Amino acid sequence: MIIDYKKEGKLGIFTINRPEALNAINVQAARELHDALVDFRDDPELWAGIFTGAGEKAFCAGADIKDMLPFLKEILPASPWKMPATNMRGLKIWKPLIAAINGLALGGGLELALACDIRIASEKARFGLPEVTLGLIPGWGGTQRLPRLIPACKAAELLFTGKLIDAQEAYRIGLVNTVVPPEAVLSTAKEWAQQICQAGPLAVRAAKQAMIRGLSMTLEDGLKLENDLEGYAMSTEDFAEGTKAFTEKRKPDFKAK
């Protein structure tokens, strides 16, 4: 197995385990990632997910060109996105996702991180979308997510040149949430995930859905979506428990119901 998928309490941990190839994604890895994400999405006991890479050099160096190229050439002309659906494209996951970026995040690796909600970076991490240097463009959401996350001029700089930036520059432009020592990347991601899991899980998913879907809506439509999702949250058992716990001055015991 290339995707090492483990469950730790309320967390789903996804580790790309190809350190000898800088954790590049091949066809097998893409299929395994799809299967793991579907299981994560559908498991009611899992409330948050973390992505990371095996070893110290790379989070994910993108697509394994030698392995993926024949596959892509076969499917792209007829159906550009017959790739296995993941959080990057084709699979909607409203549970929060955190990228623990322990090294290189290049091409599809950066796109995987962009498809997460929170990004924790190692001091040694480097980021880039070098696809244009191969005569290609990012195809796993990079052209769409990057300019939604950072200023358009900085997105253009990365997209048009394929240049790499370090962790501090990524933090400066708002690409990552925080930068930590290499040995603290995964533990920090778990701390953030555990903090998220203290909140009502259905409310967190509703907030994520409102945020993501609202980006493609007018303000008026986004406000209506927010109102609808707030109504949903207020109908849950978790909301009743949360308000009761508040009045009783205790921690709520949320059940994702």
Briefly describe each language-model feature range.
Residues 1-56, 71:
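Conserved CoA-thioester-binding segment of acyl-CoA-metabolizing enzymes
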Residues 1-8, 42, 56, 162-168, ...:
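C-terminal alpha-helix plus adjacent terminal tail
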Residues 14, 18, 32-33, 51, ...:
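Terminal peptide-recognition signature
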Residues 30-42, 65-102, 134, 149:
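An acidic, glycine-rich surface segment that forms the CoA-thioester-binding/catalytic face
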Residues 56-60, 106-107:
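Short, active-site-adjacent cap segments at secondary-structure transitions
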Residues 89-204, 235-236, 240-241, 248-250:
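Crotonase-fold acyl-CoA enzyme core
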